[in-house]
From Swiss-Prot:
Source organism (scientific name): Neosartorya fischeri (strain ATCC 1020 / DSM 3700 / CBS 544.65 / FGSC A1164 / JCM 1740 / NRRL 181 / WB 181)
Active site positions, chain numbering: 301
Composition skew (Polar residues), residue ranges: 359-451
Propeptide stretch(es), residue numbers: 20-172
Name of the protein this chain belongs to: Neutral protease 2 homolog NFIA_031120
């Protein structure tokens, strides 16, 4: 199956067009006013495939999280609810929502419960960002969401009558009486580790690897490097003060917003940080690139607190794939970007994933097959090509087998995984499997007829942004 250079070029262009899904996965949010400050959000799966996502820190979360942004005269109204850090694996089913293509669900909430709207008058409401998708109860990637812009005329008298979601507590001490015994020891160690790791990350932001910095903050400009370094330096300083700084720290939950999926949360409006029970199950410091631990959880939470470094950050992209998909300006305002960068500096993670962290199919999805570019998505049709490699599914056995350093495929006549050296041997679907299609990259595409040629390209299919 030989083709000319011109045909190869034409097919490569066609491949580039076909590689994108017909309807990229996304959630569309329609906001409407129920009455005064009470809002209804209709969440719709606008993509072409069923998706499962984490609805914590999103619509359907019963906690007072930031679901929308509010603006008065183009200035954002201060949010007075909580910002949570979630576990990345072992998520409970109750934290997940599954939507078929075109399916919707609704969530109603009162924006006056998490913002001071007693002034009344015109307020603009909108939201956008990324929501984590999940597979096997683990965060495996992300999809974007965005809403319409809703204009309200707030009745101040009615807004005053809405109770605040967070009741003020006595905060006379910086590290509260909940931090005693073993929990005090855990917190003190975590603060020391956070101070050390954040300090190293601040130095790396100022004068370290530009490639590593750009991986997380999408820029190497001096202004952005200085801004990141300044925030991380402030986080390191806050952690080193061990209770003498701007935050108030709780070793247990005084407000009742922890659950089995939340590591910790911050109340930015009062600079309070709360550890949940799950925090104490984390390692002090992880050995895994982009893993979660106690130290980087504190870094994440301290970036939310404006008393540490104003303004506090948001949760715009959660996890490595979402955080590294943000623009430079959004990454500057994203808590997980700082925690992930600090982890990467500490463990020297540059190049270990290259942004190609995929499913391995043998354990939890989202793991990287170390030392190779062998990846599986475990979720779609066999024959998909993962970018940067020519390693593919065979569709007949278990995913996760590695064919390193070759274009090794199943030949169908003997044991799977045999190597056809010196060729790009694939299934052609028309005769016996294992035939050789020399001088081309002939492969299954999983969506049409087998045996199509995708010359001089890595054919990529898949309707999710992979983790």
């Amino acid at each position: 199956m030989k083709i000319t250079a011109l045909a190869s070029a034409i097919l490569a262009v066609v491949h580039g067009a076909l590689a994108l899904p017909a309807r990229a996965p996304a959630l569309d949010i329609t906001l409407s006013q129920v009455n005064n400050t009470r809002i209804k959000a209709v969440v719709k799966n606008s993509g072409s495939e069923k998706i499962t996502f984490v609805h914590l820190n999103f619509f359907n979360d019963p906690s007072p999280v930031k679901k929308v942004s509010l603006y008065r005269n183009a200035t954002e109204v201060e949010f007075t609810g909580i910002k949570q850090r979630l576990r990345s694996d072992g998520l409970s089913n109750e934290a997940l929502t599954t939507l078929a293509p075109g399916a919707t669900y609704e969530d109603e909430f009162d924006i006056a419960s998490t913002a001071n709207l007693t002034q009344g008058g015109p307020v603009t409401v909108r939201t956008q960002g990324f929501v984590p998708i999940a597979m096997n109860n683990k965060i495996a990637g992300y999809i974007p969401y965005s809403s319409n812009e809703l204009e309200l005329e707030v009745d101040a008298v009615k807004a005053v009558a809405v109770p605040a979601s967070i009741k003020p507590l006595d905060r006379r001490t910086k590290i509260t009486s909940s931090c005693t015994g073993d929990r005090a020891a855990v917190l003190n160690t975590a603060l020391r580790n956070a101070a050390s790791i954040a300090g190293k990350a601040a130095n790396a932001a100022s004068s370290g690897s530009s490639a590593l910095f750009a991986e997380y903050f999408k820029s190497t400009s001096g202004n952005i490097r200085s801004a990141v370094a300044a925030r991380l330096k402030a986080v390191a300083s806050e952690a080193s003060l061990n209770g003498g700084g701007s935050t108030t720290y709780y070793c247990s939950d005084p407000y009742g917003y922890c659950d089995s999926n939340v590591l910790a949360y911050t109340l930015p409006s009062t600079n309070e940080v709360v550890n949940c029970e799950l925090f104490y199950t984390l390692q002090e410091v992880t050995n895994d690139c982009h893993g979660q631990d106690q130290a980087t959880t504190i870094i994440h939470e301290f970036t939310h607190a404006p008393g540490v470094y104003p303004p506090g950050t948001e949760d715009l992209g959660y996890g490595y794939s979402a955080a590294t998909a943000l623009s430079a300006n959004n990454a500057l305002n994203n808590a997980d970007s700082y925690a992930l960068f600090a982890n990467a500096v500490y463990l020297n993670c540059q190049g270990q994933t290259g942004g190609q962290t995929m499913w391995d199919g043998n354990s939890q999805p989202g793991q990287t097959a170390p030392g190779t570019q062998t990846m599986w998505d475990g979720n779609s049709q066999p024959g998909q090509t993962e970018p940067g490699t020519q390693t593919m599914w065979d569709g007949n056995s278990q995913p996760g087998q590695t064919e390193p350093g070759t274009q090794t495929m199943w030949d169908g006549n003997s044991q799977p995984g045999q190597t056809e050296p010196g060729t790009q041997t694939m299934w052609d679907g028309n005769s016996q499997p294992g035939q050789t299609e020399p001088c081309t990259q002939t492969m299954w595409d999983g969506s049409s007829e087998p045996g199509q040629t995708e010359p001089d390209a890595h054919t990529t299919w898949g309707n999710f942004y992979q983790a």
